[in-house]
From Swiss-Prot:
It is found in: Cytoplasm. This is HTH-type transcriptional regulator MgrA. Keywords: Activator, Cytoplasm, DNA-binding, Repressor, Transcription, Transcription regulation, Virulence. Transmembrane segments: none annotated. In strain Becker, gene disruption may lead to increase in alpha-hemolysin (hla). The keyword DNA-binding applies. PANTHER family: ORGANIC HYDROPEROXIDE RESISTANCE TRANSCRIPTIONAL REGULATOR, TRANSCRIPTIONAL REGULATOR, MARR FAMILY. Gene3D superfamilies: Winged helix-like DNA-binding domain superfamily/Winged helix DNA-binding domain (1.10.10.10). GO terms for cellular component: cytoplasm. PROSITE patterns: HTH_MARR_1 (PS01117), HTH_MARR_2 (PS50995). Its main location: cytoplasm. It comes from Staphylococcus aureus.
Length: 147
């Protein structure tokens, strides 16, 4: 059997499987107590860095489209993780704010990424190198998308 047909030799399968394993770890070990999803955590991470922000910033930072982000934000608002407010200057612009609930869970989730890095059994240097290589892959596909 050639390497081309061996799943373990396919970059795409390795990326897919690693992503599934990391998401499972986040869901079962890190976020379960908070009934939080990884995309919700990413939104909170953006807001913990800077709040309020407009929806466009979240869309850009997460590299998702508005059609994906809007329902995500709606669910987060329903469980009191964020508050959405229309701009007084431009009613088309919506700002996202943290809530008391999202501020309360912040200290407990501040090291979530460290927990995953630790569980991965990679050294800090290996994590940096993996992030560099993944950034290269992401950039290459972004370039392909633009052509």
């Amino acid at each position: 059997m050639s390497d081309q047909h061996n799943l373990k030799e396919q970059l795409c399968f390795s990326l897919y499987n690693a992503q599934r394993q990391v998401n499972r770890y986040y869901s079962n070990k890190v976020f379960k107590k908070y009934n939080l999803t990884y995309p919700q955590f990413l939104v909170l991470t953006i807001l913990w860095d800077e709040s309020p922000v407009n929806v466009k910033k979240v869309v850009t930072e997460l590299a998702l489209d508005t059609g994906t982000v809007s329902p995500l934000l709606k669910r987060m608002e329903q469980v009191d993780l964020i508050k959405r407010e229309r701009s007084e200057v431009d009613q088309r612009e919506v700002f996202i704010h943290l809530t008391d609930k999202s501020e309360t869970i912040r200290p407990e989730l501040s090291n979530a990424s460290d927990k995953v890095a630790s569980a991965s059994s990679l050294s800090q240097d290996e994590v940096k190198e993996l992030n560099r290589l993944l950034g290269k892959v992401i950039h290459a596909f972004d370039e392909t998308k633009e052509k």
